[in-house]
């Protein structure tokens, strides 16, 4: 089926459109401009042990995320695989038990039909579940939404995300004493991740 798909829809770079070998891959030039695996120390992020960033939010990567979130192009989410593959090769992660996606509001999910974070990361986690003993756990609830935060100042973001998340009651016990990996699509100030980490630590994670 893969060869038929490639025949009918020849694989192209998601940004510049030039031919590539496989669906979901980038041309070297476009990938080099946005691939940027780096680590931020924990002292910059209250409640977190650290933060891995996979790419620069610009150019082709910015367009890709925007299309998945706002232009109903969910199939484009597969184009993050080169970033996750490169991250895998670096063997960066400490031992973890559970991987939790940052949720979107119920209103946005009803409009969009999915949480883009699931599309970017869930398959990657499930493919490695046996090897790493990971479990994908959709344990967080986003209680409300007051619009997108990309235009807000750091102080406005902090006020916005305070008490923004809650934990699904059926998962409270499962979180106790566990090492967690939070995944999200965009990192700006870290306020969203810090807010999620705060409530998870209160639950004993």
Locate each region found by the language model:
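Glycine-rich phosphate/pyrophosphate-handling loop used in enzymes and phosphotransfer proteins
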Residues: 1-205
């Amino acid at each position: 089926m893969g060869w038929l798909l490639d025949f009918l829809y020849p694989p192209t770079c998601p940004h510049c459109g030039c031919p590539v070998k496989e669906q979901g891959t980038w041309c070297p030039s476009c990938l080099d401009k946005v691939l940027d695996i780096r680590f931020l120390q924990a002292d910059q992020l209250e409640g977190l042990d650290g933060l891995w960033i996979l790419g620069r939010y610009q150019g082709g990567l910015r367009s890709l995320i925007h299309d998945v979130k706002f232009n109903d192009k969910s199939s484009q989410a597969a184009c993050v695989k080169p970033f996750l593959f490169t991250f895998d090769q670096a063997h960066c992660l400490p031992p973890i038990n559970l991987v939790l996606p940052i949720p979107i509001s119920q209103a946005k999910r009803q409009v969009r039909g999915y949480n883009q974070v699931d599309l970017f990361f869930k398959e990657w986690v499930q493919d490695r579940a046996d090897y790493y003993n990971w479990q994908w756990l959709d344990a967080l609830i986003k209680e409300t939404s007051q619009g997108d935060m990309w235009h807000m100042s750091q102080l406005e973001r902090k006020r916005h995300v305070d008490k923004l998340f809650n934990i699904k009651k059926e998962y409270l016990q499962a979180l106790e004493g566990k090492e967690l990996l939070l995944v999200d699509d965009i990192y700006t100030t870290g306020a969203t991740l810090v807010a999620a980490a705060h409530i998870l630590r209160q639950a004993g994670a």
